[in-house]
Amino acid sequence: MGKLEVIAHPLIQHKLSILRRTDTSTKAFRELVDEIAMLMGYEVLRDLPLEDVEIETPITKTIQKQIAGKKLAIVPILRAGIGMVDGLLSLVPAAKVGHIGMYRDEETLKPVEYLVKLPEDIDQRQIFVVDPMLATGGSAILAVDSLKKRGASHITFVCLVSAPEGVKALQEAHPDVDIFTAALDDHLNDHGYIVPGLGDAGDRLFGTK
């Protein structure tokens, strides 16, 4: 079973509390999502392999460490996942970015896929799927399904807020996928929203209804 890690760093929790507030502006919400994603990146990327490299300082030659030549890809689930991309890219700027577009049918609560645009060598990359919320788990499962159909095997899911129902569903569907979240909330309401949650992340990111 893939691991579930709740990143409880004080800075992340402080910023997440502001993110949740109803009176947080679109501008502030967007900035906070970016900042939290970057802060989470330190833990999400903790296990990247290192290799020795010889460098020359102003004083002498020395053997130091650098990230090994592991190919990375960040794949946001559109549209809200876009808000997390730059924060992670600031840490690993050489990573490629793919896109998986989905919308949720408000009657069935099921995700509908409308776009898949990925690097050609996605099957060779370590992939970080990003979406601010893991609610029912439907979108996350469908995104991982799409990636695995294209040969991907090393996949991690990164979100800001999650519900126990979504975590359980993703773990059952894809037990090899690790999940990183800034918060594990209480439950889903009758409309499939996370409680206490933060509302509709896409609408709050882009100022839409």
UniProtKB/Swiss-Prot annotation:
Instruction: Report the protein name in the record.
Output: Uracil phosphoribosyltransferase
Tell me which HAMAP family the record gives. Upp_B (MF_01218_B)
Q: Which residues bind 5-phospho-alpha-D-ribose 1-diphosphate?
A: 79, 104, 131-139, 200
What job does the chain carry out?
A: Catalyzes the conversion of uracil and 5-phospho-alpha-D-ribose 1-diphosphate (PRPP) to UMP and diphosphate.
Which cofactor is recorded for it?
Mg(2+)
InterPro entries in the record = PRibTrfase_dom, PRTase-like, Upp_B, UPRTase/APRTase, Ura_phspho_trans
Provide the catalytic activity annotation.
UMP + diphosphate = 5-phospho-alpha-D-ribose 1-diphosphate + uracil
Write one Pfam family the protein is assigned to: UPRTase
Question: Is Nucleotide-binding among this UniProt entry's keywords?
Answer: yes
Protein's pathway: Pyrimidine metabolism; UMP biosynthesis via salvage pathway; UMP from uracil: step 1/1
The molecular function GO annotations come to: GTP binding; magnesium ion binding; uracil phosphoribosyltransferase activity
| Keyword vocabulary terms for this entry | Allosteric enzyme, Glycosyltransferase, GTP-binding, Magnesium, Nucleotide-binding, Transferase
Tell me which EC number(s) this protein carries. Answer: 2.4.2.9
Q: rRNA-binding as a keyword? A: no
Per the entry, the cofactor note is: Binds 1 Mg(2+) ion per subunit. The magnesium is bound as Mg-PRPP.
Q: Tell me the residue numbers annotated for binding uracil.
A: 194, 199-201
Q: Which gene encodes it?
A: upp
Note the superkingdom of the native organism: Bacteria
How its function is modulated: the record gives:
Allosterically activated by GTP.
Family under the similarity heading = Belongs to the UPRTase family.
Residue stretches spanning the membrane: none
Which GO terms fall under biological process for this protein?
Answer: UMP salvage; uracil salvage
